[in-house]
Amino acid sequence: MGRRFAAVAIVALGFGARAQDAAARPLVTRVHGIATGIAACWHPPHDDDQVTVRTSFTREGAVIGEPRIVFVQSSGGRADDAALADSMKAAMRDCTPLHFSARLGSAIAGQVLDIRFIGPTRATIVAPP
């Protein structure tokens, strides 16, 4: 009985921490905020690396499925492209779910978005495919 209670308590604490993390994230009210929210968590190997990722989100700001890297250009050369793609996948995993406003979530839920990142400070939503 004691072990079961301890296991339940640990799981509950984990869910509480995750909910607290989501609440601490800034509210995203515009489409461009999606790109800047993810860019804030991205740590590319070089400052002028470029990545375009294709993804979609739920109303609540969670990624639907696996984000697809559609373009990678590392300033370190082709040998660094895999590490660059991995850094973007890590940012998508670690930075989501984003905290969408109800209005934004309703507008973009399920829509495919291409997000272009140029270094850690420039990010834009490009025309959907």
Please provide the spans of the model-predicted regions.
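Cleaved targeting-peptide boundary
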Residues: 19-29
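Short hydrophobic/aromatic-rich motifs at helix boundaries and adjacent loops
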Residues: 9, 25, 60-64
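An anionic, turn-rich surface loop/hairpin at beta-sheet edges
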Residues: 78-84
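Bacterial N-terminal signal peptides that target proteins for export
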Residues: 1-6
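Conserved "boundary/linchpin" sites in short secondary-structure elements
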Residues: 36-43, 56-75, 89-129
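Hydrophobic h-region of N-terminal signal peptides that target proteins for export
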Residues: 8-19
